[in-house]
Amino acid sequence: MNTTINVHLNVTVDDNNSDSVYDVPTLILVLLSILYGTISVLAVLGNSLVIWIIVTSKRMHNVTNYYIANLALADIVIGLFAIPFQFQAALLQRWNLPHFMCAFCPFVQILSVNVSVFTLTAIAIDRHRAILKPLSVRPSKLTAKIVIAGIWLVAMVLATPMAVARRVIMVPEGLIWSPTDIDKLKPFCQAVNLSSRTMLIYSMLLAFLQYLTPLSIIFCVYTRMALKLWGNRAPGNAEDFRDANFM
């Protein structure tokens, strides 16, 4: 069976060998591996516990907790599929994992971040409705489930270009490379199926939809809630002397 290898060479051609771009000290590698591994394990265990509590307790079955469970699920996904693999690739400067994961891991990372941000936005809107219109009809559990499904669908669509773009290619080990050093190539995960201009537009679109738009919505609704609560007085007659005795 013939194997086709894509080699991307953006280096200086020279007959001399060279070291890699940078070498990570073993101690730093071990320390960061422990830290990232701990973060990943805690993220999975902690958020799994949150989901388990919400699922097993009927009184926890409400719209807000559904959103919280969805937020926890997104954190579990990023803890399982993004943190460990993206970390090792960044440190080792090569892709030692199965090639399909080159597209899968960045896709999952963007997917999880999108779900988290959109869910936080949904929670903010739900709290805004509860505080500013407390007597209005509360969204049903079915509505919350539909919103959550929509969040995952939109997040998946926005993450798809990254899966399309990323592929494993062979690149030189060092900055200086000679055509005779064919054995000194390494696998590297890189965006090759989409042009640099397309990736720039995609990054700008993500920044707008993933950061600026949710931030604006959350800022506006929480500002309105703060103003509403700040101007409200507690029920009952205020008595300064009585209230001072409770302080």
Describe each PLM feature range.
Residues 1-45:
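Extracellular N-terminal segment of 7TM GPCRs
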Residues 25-37, 60-125, 129-144:
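Extracellular TM2-ECL1-early TM3 structural module of rhodopsin-like
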Residues 44-55, 76, 83, 111-134, ...:
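Cytoplasm-facing ends of alpha-helical transmembrane segments in multi-pass membrane proteins
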Residues 12-23, 90-114, 130-133, 139, ...:
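Loop architecture of class A 7-transmembrane GPCRs
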Residues 37-46, 208-218:
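Single-pass alpha-helical transmembrane segments
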Residues 68-72, 152, 207:
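Transmembrane helix-bundle signature of multi-pass membrane transporters/permeases
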Residues 1-6, 69-79, 170-181:
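Alpha-helical transmembrane segments of integral membrane proteins, especially early/N-terminal helices
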